[in-house]
Amino acid sequence: MRFLGHASSAEGLHVHRPEEIIMLVAESGAGGVLDPQERRLLENTLRWRDLTARQAMVARTRMLGAPVDLPREEMLELLASSPHTRLLLYEDSIDNIVGTVHLKDLMCPPAGAWDARRVVRTVPFVPEAAPVAEVFAQLQRRRQALAVVLDEYGGTAGMVSVDDVVEAIVG
């Protein structure tokens, strides 16, 4: 195209597809140029666009949740015995999540009789097959820390947080 007076925007550049970069990273790791941690971080970063919510999520059996009508003191006890600051709240079963309650809302409840429904924070719901990159972007856009992951039947499969996404990349 240069002979027609059109310059290529990639002229002089070595452009690589992600698969080729992964191969270069693997070869650099095998050749001792990268240590194993650097290699894993680079490979995970390049593969994160292929990662799904299911692959990064915390399974429902490991989620911290409680019925929305649980007394406030019991919610506080659940959070006190865990490393978390948020508690998933559900109506009837874990398949019917209504949102989360934050520790600070439990510590400083609104005046009047306790009703978690008054302080519950909504959470987004995403399908298991949702790309982690899209889930991460949605959480950032909505300024939320976690999303509930739904299985193919609409039941709760698990949850994925910003920290889970970072962990999936960093390892």
Language-model-detected regions and their locations in the chain:
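Low-complexity, charge- and small-residue-enriched intrinsically disordered regions
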Residues: 1-16
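Soluble cytosolic regulatory domains appended to membrane proteins
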Residues: 12-171
